[in-house]
Each structure stands twice: as structure tokens, then as C-alpha cells.
């Protein structure tokens, strides 16, 4: 029980830290930025009220994957401040980032108190965006990564994105190993066949 409560406290503290970093690194806020701020405040509430998991993956590999997923977006922003990148297609990038923000917000609201960053079994959500793919939150991360890199990129940001995506793939497999213990999981997998990209994977 202590470990689980510590995880809730850690999520709360990390989210507060993310908010501080977001305000420090963002000179002017767009609507998309405010959507992400709103999401962070929602996570703060969830961290204090969410259900305790029935099963939890405490492995070092999962911890490393979660850490990588938290670090790589901010590492891109910081590196681009030190070494400016190239502009590819800003308009398309803005569209993707906006779509990603909307998808992640809807996904977070759909998850509610079942939200977590470490693979855990708190319940099974099959409604909303989870009726289209099994991991819509990670799809939003990928859309955002592509969008931000269309606005500005260099070889280092691309490398960071690849590392981040590798961590997401690991987390998907780790989460599905845990979720497979839910009685309704087999039926859900039949109903929603694809993890991230309909028709592909």
C-alpha cells in the first residue's frame, strides 16, 4: 500500500514539475498549450483520487520506459533552444499538434481515475477513443511528435523521437500483459484489433 501511495505522490510531484517546466519553456501560450495545462491539472486531481491497481508492473524495464517517455519531449525543446533546427511544414505541424492535444484530452477524460503512467490493472476502458484503437493516448503522443518536428527539427530531435517511440512500444506490450488479466480483455481485443494505427498495428 505504501508503494502505491508513493506512486500517487510521485505522479503528483512530477506533474507539478512538468507544469513549472511548461511555463518556463513556453514564452507565449496558444490554445493548444492551455489544453495541455488543463490536462496537467486533471492529472493532479487523478493522482490524489485514482483507484489503486489490482496488478502493477514494478519492473526496472517499465520504470526506464516511463522515464524515457517523460524526458524525451522536454529534451527536444531544450536541445532546439541550444541548437536551432530546420523548419519543414509548420502549418501541417500545427494541425497535428492541435489534433494530438484534443485526442489526449478526450482520452484522459475517458480514463478518469483509471489513468496511470506505469503498466497497471485498475480496470478496462473500452469506450470513446478506446473503441477505435487500444492505446489512443500513445497515438496522441506520436501525432504531437510528428507535428512538433514538422515545425522545427534536427537530427537530434529525430533521434530523441525514435527513443521515445521505442519506449512507447515497450509500454504498450507491458500494459497489454497486465491488462490481459482482466476478464473482458479477450473480447475487447477481438472488438478493437489495432493498438495504435487502424489497419496497420
Task: Locate predicted features.
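Membrane-anchoring alpha-helices and their flanking helix-loop junctions
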Residues: 1-118, 147-201
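Solvent-exposed interhelical
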Residues: 122-140, 190
